[in-house]
Curated annotation (Swiss-Prot):
Its EC number is 1.-.-.-. The keyword Acetylation applies. GO terms for molecular function: alcohol dehydrogenase (NADP+) activity; oxidoreductase activity, acting on the CH-OH group of donors, NAD or NADP as acceptor. This is Uncharacterized oxidoreductase YghA. The gene is yghA.
Length: 294
């Protein structure tokens, strides 16, 4: 009997109820709760005894990656904002149920001191580090440039771009040959929305920084690749990432006619972390429901 499923209906296809949470949002309080593979992702030992740091690992795409890494046999450290402790504790429980070590490292990635120390704390707690999945990001929709403040513009770049620089600069000397860095850009790097000027600009910066870094560290045996999600149902969207009028139809403009779920990105983060992608570096992997990159 075939286990094939229709991808257009495999996950939630209805309208999303309007809902607003303070930034950064708590996934457990969303309706519907995003699917991060808690009940569905099955590992096969592809990352046995690897050591992973996942930023934004409490919810959304980062949570899905962290769960998948643990089920593939890796020990996992996650970073998150202190207000996201509820979601983070849930991820910790799931990782430990896999028989793997879970390390919680709360803090603000826009703080250079914290971001730089995060790498060393994860390395120490895990007894090494060979996977970095950099997922955490800031997205706040502002329809009119007149309302976009310098404070928000700077904060978005600090979390999305400067933290990427701080984290990777600290990590490169610590990473062994065979290590993998996975950054998170967006379809917004290619098709910027008018209400996401600062966010889209950071995602283009991530793309080029990652490609350049990949070429620089290739001779060290370290790979760097980029995941570019399309519209994915996460706490980012309901905590200011979209205006409320866009929530009900979120993702329905794609050829798949629905938003993606974080669980649908987890296999990409696993593949790029694994030895199966040994000849893959400086590449962008879109997960956009049929929307094209470029």
């Amino acid at each position: 009997m075939s286990h094939l499923k229709d991808p257009t209906t495999q996950y939630y296809t209805g309208e999303y109820p309007k809902q607003k949470q303070p930034t950064p949002g708590i996934q457990a309080k969303m309706t519907p709760v995003p699917d991060c593979g808690e009940k569905t992702y099955v590992g096969s030992g592809r990352l046995k005894d690897r050591k992973a740091l996942v930023t934004g690992g409490d919810s959304g795409i980062g949570r899905a990656a962290a769960i998948a890494y643990a089920r593939e046999g890796a020990d996992v450290a996650i970073s998150y904002l202190p207000v996201e402790e509820e979601d983070a504790q849930d991820v910790k429980k799931i990782i430990e149920e896999c028989g793997r070590k879970a390390v919680l490292l709360p803090g603000d990635l826009s703080d250079e001191k914290f971001a730089r120390s995060l790498v060393h704390e994860a390395h120490k707690a895990l007894g090494g580090l060979d996977i970095m999945a950099l997922v955490a990001g800031k997205q706040v929709a502002i329809p009119d440039i007149a309302d976009l403040t310098s404070e928000q513009f700077q904060k978005t770049f600090a979390i999305n771009v400067f933290a990427l620089f701080w984290l990777t600069q600290e990590a490169i000397p610590l990473l062994p040959k065979g290590a993998s860095i996975i950054t998170t850009s967006s379809i917004q790097a290619y098709q910027p929305s008018p209400h996401l000027l600062d966010y889209a600009a950071t995602k283009a910066a991530i793309l080029n920084y990652s490609r350049g870094l990949a070429k620089q560290v290739a001779e060290k045996g370290i790979r760097v690749n980029i995941v570019a999600p399309g519209p994915i149902w996460t706490a980012l969207q309901i905590s200011g990432g979209q205006t409320q009028d866009k929530i009900p139809q979120f993702g329905q403009q794609t050829p798949m006619k629905r938003a993606g779920q974080p669980a649908e990105l987890a296999p990409v983060y696993v593949y790029l972390a694994s030895q199966e992608s040994s000849y893959v570096t400086a590449e962008v992997h879109g997960v956009c429901g049929g929307e094209h990159l470029g």
